[in-house]
Amino acid sequence: MSDQSMSVTLLAIESSCDETAAAVIQDGNILCNIVASQRIHEKYGGIVPELASRAHQQHIIPVVAQALLEANIQKSDLNAVACTSGPGLLGALLVGVSFSKAFASALHIPVIKVNHMKAHILAHFIGDVKPSFPFICMTVSGGHTQLVIVRNYLEMEVVGETQDDAVGEAFDKTAKLMGLPYPGGPLIDSYAKQGNPLAFPFPTVDMPGYNYSFSGIKTAFMYFLKKNTAVDPDFIQKNLPDICASVQHALIDVLMRKLKRLVVDTGINRVAIAGGVSANSGLRKAMEQKREQEGWDVYIPAFEYCTDNAAMIAVAGYHQYLENDFAGWDLSPEPRLRIGGGL
């Protein structure tokens, strides 16, 4: 293990999807967290990989420069560079990985490859309130829906995951069916606050064990809209809050049922959520209800750490640095990188 009595300063880079981000961490404390988001994808109704990688190329140097400036850190102060190696979009990851390798090589310091999904989980170690090990984390995003047992900073086991759509993808697809712009998930959440979650029931599929399925809800929702708009073309407009509240309720119900099953089966009542969908107010409320009704120790990330950011990459990279977990110079992007163990 590295000598922790010495100051350890890392630059972290995140470029897995449509945010170009950089952060600086020193002795476990985040000094800055810079994120450049890409608005160009909205008119296409989803992420366009080629446009994403081009935008990363435009943003990465100014974002890193801004991070070093805000942290008041010189390049010579850095001990290593941590970067997201996967999962994510190949072209987007390539920009961050290539920059990180070149930057680290020029400074004669090591590069650390970070698993993006592990980093989402470790975002819980940024603030003052941190979970104790072991704990359960439900990772919920546009690309992933997983139940993970977190044993320490480096050891995690996936015990359940979606067998089709990720929950964030289900939110965006149902929003698109209603004619809402991309990204639709936050819009559903916003409209749902004024609606009745029990107005329109949707069938859900109970997969074996801790696995998830959301495609059934999406299909049922499509036929629900088709049937009702055939009778009244203005059905969606007239009932938008109730429709949004109902579909959100169905999706969250699926998430929480499996999460509760895992808590009961393992006896681990320290429970966290992570990933973009952890910003959803309905999910956050459901977690708070479990805290109040069933005594769970609940950990909900600050909004700025729900979506992709480099601070979480910095935390993961810092703990890997302490264990001398460095990558070779042959490091390449791993678009389908998984959390180890389990499934």
Swiss-Prot record:
GO CC annotation, single: cytoplasm
Binding residues annotated for substrate, in chain numbering: T139, V140, S141, G142, G143, D172, G185, D189, N280
Cofactor note: Binds 1 Fe(2+) ion per subunit.
GO molecular function, one term: N(6)-L-threonylcarbamoyladenine synthase activity
A GO BP entry: tRNA threonylcarbamoyladenosine modification
Reactions this protein catalyses: L-threonylcarbamoyladenylate + adenosine(37) in tRNA = N(6)-L-threonylcarbamoyladenosine(37) in tRNA + AMP + H(+)
First-listed, main subcellular location of the protein, grouped into a coarse class: cytoplasm
EC numbers on record: 2.3.1.234
Needed co-factor(s): Fe(2+)
NCBIfam families: gcp_kae1, T6A_TsaD_YgjD
Role description: Required for the formation of a threonylcarbamoyl group on adenosine at position 37 (t(6)A37) in tRNAs that read codons beginning with adenine. Is involved in the transfer of the threonylcarbamoyl moiety of threonylcarbamoyl-AMP (TC-AMP) to the N6 group of A37, together with TsaE and TsaB. TsaD likely plays a direct catalytic role in this reaction.
HAMAP family: TsaD
Family: Belongs to the KAE1 / TsaD family.
Protein name: tRNA N6-adenosine threonylcarbamoyltransferase
Organism, as annotated: Cytophaga hutchinsonii (strain ATCC 33406 / DSM 1761 / CIP 103989 / NBRC 15051 / NCIMB 9469 / D465)
Originating gene: tsaD
